[in-house]
Amino acid sequence: MSSNTVAEFATELKKSPATLLDQLKAAGVGKAALSDALTESDKQRLLAYLQASHGTTSVDRKKITLVKKSTSEIKQADATGKARTIQVEVRKKRTFVKRDDAQEGAADGAGSAAFAEPEHPAPAAQHDVPEAPAEQAQADAAPAADGAAPALSSEDQELARREEQARHQAELIRRQEAELAAKRAAREAREKREREAEERAAAYAAQEAEKKAAASAVKQVATREQAAEATARNAAQLQARAKAAAESKARSDEEAARAADLDARRRKAEAEAAAIRSMLATPKKAVMVAKKPEPPPKPVPKPAAAAGDAKKGTLHKPAVGATRTAAGAARAGAAAGAPGAGKEVKSAKLSSSWAGDPAKKKEIKTRGDSSGGVGRNNWRGGPRGRRGDSRDQRDEHLQAAPAETRIIEVHVPETITVAEVAHKMSIKASEVIKALMKMGQMVTINQPLDQDTAMIVVEELGHKAVVAALDDPEAFADDDVAQQSIEVLPRAPVVTVMGHVDHGKTSLLDYIRRAKVAASEAGGITQHIGAYHVQTPRGMVSFLDTPGHEAFTAMRARGAQATDIVILVVAADDGVMPQTREAIKHAKAAGVPIVVAITKADKPDANLDRVKQELIGEQVVPEDYGGDSPFVAVSSKTGQGIDALLEHVLLQADVMELKAPVDALAKGLVIEAQLDKGRGPVATVLVQSGTLKVGDVVLAGQTFGRVRAMLDENGRPAKTAGPSIPVEIQGLTEVPQAGDEFMVLTDERRAREIATYRAGRFRNTKLAKQQAAKLEHVFADMTAGEVKMLPIIVKADVQGSQEALAQSLLKLSTDEVKVQLVYAAVGAISESDINLAIASKAVVIGFNVRADAGARKLAEGNGVALHYYSIIYDAVDELRVAMSGMLAPEQREEIIGTAEIRTVFTASKIGTVAGSYITSGMVHRNARFRLLRANVVVHTGEVDSIKRLKDDVREVKEGFECGIKLKNYSDILEGDQLEFFDIKQIARTL
């Protein structure tokens, strides 16, 4: 087949068309495109060019070699039975030889050309030398030119390919058999080695048994010798331990002596430094002398110089006589030409930090001094011929040894003033200010510095800065309270009244105090912790009245922690209730004794035995039954059993022997806290030890302050408060947390540092918890459905009520509606609270507080809802109703009727219509339906329209026939049943 175009010729030659075009152009054949036609003459020119380029000019070729390559795949299973795909590549090479004319004539019945035997095909792993492009072109062009070479038959190709595949398969099988044989031989060798190892182990075990049997006799003999050696060795060890203990004691004594020596040297150096500072602080007077001739100075005796060398390097204040002698020697050494030499010169042995700069500091001008006292030792310092004095003075300064630099380890707290930094380094405050000015900070001597800045300044001045760990406040209190002898005296018991709501706790205290507190409580329930102390014939008793409502769990827990005795109030007509059980748990957790007061004993339906049995079930056993809890039946109206109750309380206190120091710094507990508009932060505290006085520095949690005023429970001013006395204090910087411990410190700066540290630590902990919660719930929030949020802002009158209300509201959260507490604080509602509510779209709740005029106006202008409550029940109930309105309504089905399809007909403009008979109830337009076929629901949809006697109707009742058109559904049959229902939305509640 002759090639007519360049592309066909390139395909026939199995060459790149671009390469063929380049070769054609080089051969002088002008072909520019692949579609250009090629003639036989063009092919001859290309062949001649290629032969010439490869060094062959003979056109007469006697032999042509054809190379053909084919690729195939075979699948063969290996030894494991897994099928493997093998790539097989077959290469064939055939050579065609052109015979001479004589040979053609001699050939008998032979063809015009004969081909040699095909060479063995090379497998894919062998590499054949590729034919040159010119030879390929010649191989393709020669048959075209001569027309005598026969084409390679396809049958021969297939036969050769199959032979090659068979050969490869046979080789693969032989290789696999060899591998299997090698593995089998290796396994047999391994098994043989294992058997030999087992035999050797058995032989070794037998030998060992024989050796052990032989050695057992030897061991019996050696045991006695070993016992003797052990006894001697133990004695040697005891001697070595005694020697080591003696050496250790000697070393410890030596270290103690060294430490004492260092301490003595340090105290001596500090005393010398203090003496020098006092000397330098004393103003000096210039010595004015008349200029008169003096005899030349005499050389200083050697013993004096030796004495001076002995004191070199130490800070010694010169004696008065020595100072005068030195001054006289200076005056004697200065001649008439050295004016001003009579001035008292500062000692060169002082520290360099106290030495003035002679080039900048002006000296006092004396008689005959024309230099103005400046640079008396420079080139203008005196007349000619007197340079020896300056040289002598310069030599004296050079010979004086510099003061030894002492590196101080400075402990830097959280905040420290400039003066304190200088004091810790024993330098002037001006040096610290100068160093800070070099760092770009303008500070004053009393300005506080942060820890990082102070440490940098200390390092800049050549000392070592160490972060001072903030001491434990308890350690501070112990340091302040610890005295040589603190006398402990008996104190009054602190009694907490606990029990269920409406069981008569406050009424019982009212009768004891002869007051009427219960009548003034909102709703008749206690919502704050009340603290009182009462004088009885047998002594004083302090009472804590805790709320009984379930929301005030934290208040009851604080009351149990601060108390000595718990009075458990149980109503005789009500028995043990949930808050009664909770109070018992708090008392047992605090480890305080319980005195049971069964109130309302005068009521007709009182059942004391039932109350006792219920309390026994809560592990509170009365004394009558062999327990340790006295039971007293009381009545707050008639006073029945009140004296017996107090008698039991005081008897229990006597048994406990309650004592506390009186003449000491006060410690106690914050019972309640609030923010008063006129008085500021106010805290009700219970003094547990020591005496609290007006003017004391108080540290309570994260707040501190100086006590400005104290009031007792009746509102009267008080100057002091001893142990077990509750008082109300003013003067704190912020409202403390209820339940915090308070203590009195002697240093206000220390109290400020501790409060600041606690606030920062609390803030960091809170932020860390919030971040952890965000990271923990981020995926849950992404996967969960949309949850409705109800943001609220809570402002209350006291800390305990705010805490209780916030916790109660947060407990109302569900999976669908959550309460988001934006802000909760103590005090009146301010404009900042309203602005926060506007930004967060929150509801503002005021508990026993009101909004000021500016806040009310701002709330009305921006539509912020303000809700005021005085009873915690009302706040919780109203918020529960609001959250119920945010819940998605419940979808509920209500069946309204059924119908039977008796006929089915089709209208041209309407479609399929079900002729139905209403068997029960009724059906109306747009009602929902279920299609039942053989009592199986096959479709649920909506009624499109209803017709009766060709008229559209809204509804059809039981016993009537009608035509019903179903919306988007027409697969209905006679005998089907239709069940009609409506979906009603039912409001949900929490």
From Swiss-Prot:
Region listing for G4, in residue ranges: 599-602
SUPFAM superfamilies: Initiation factor IF2/eIF5b, domain 3, P-loop containing nucleoside triphosphate hydrolases, Putative DNA-binding domain, Translation proteins
UniProt-listed Pfam families: EF-G_D2 (PF22042), GTP_EFTU (PF00009), IF-2 (PF11987), IF2_assoc (PF08364), IF2_N (PF04760)
Chain spans, region G3: 545-548
Residue positions binding GTP: 499-506, 545-549, 599-602
Subcellular localization(s) per the UniProt record: Cytoplasm
Region (G2): 524-528
Residue ranges constituting the tr-type G domain according to the UniProt record: 490-659
InterPro entries linked to this entry: DNA-bd_dom_put_sf, EF-G-like_DII, IF2_assoc_dom_bac, IF2_II, IF2_N, P-loop_NTPase, Small_GTP-bd, T_Tr_GTP-bd_dom
Molecular-function GO terms, alphabetical: GTP binding; GTPase activity; translation initiation factor activity
Biased composition (Basic and acidic residues): 158-201, 244-264, 358-368, 386-398
Bias kind Low complexity: ranges: 104-116, 131-151, 223-243, 281-290, 318-342
Keyword terms: Cytoplasm, GTP-binding, Initiation factor, Nucleotide-binding, Protein biosynthesis
Gene3D superfamilies: P-loop containing nucleotide triphosphate hydrolases, Putative DNA-binding domain, N-terminal subdomain of bacterial translation initiation factor IF2, Translation factors, Translation initiation factor IF- 2, domain 3
Annotated GO CC locations: cytosol
Region (G1): 499-506
Region (G5): 635-637
Region (Disordered): 92-402
UniProt function note: One of the essential components for the initiation of protein synthesis. Protects formylmethionyl-tRNA from spontaneous hydrolysis and promotes its binding to the 30S ribosomal subunits. Also involved in the hydrolysis of GTP during the formation of the 70S ribosomal complex.
Recorded family membership: Belongs to the TRAFAC class translation factor GTPase superfamily. Classic translation factor GTPase family. IF-2 subfamily.
HAMAP family per record: IF_2_B
PANTHER family on file: TR-TYPE G DOMAIN-CONTAINING PROTEIN, TRANSLATION INITIATION FACTOR IF-2-RELATED
Protein name: Translation initiation factor IF-2
GN (gene name): infB
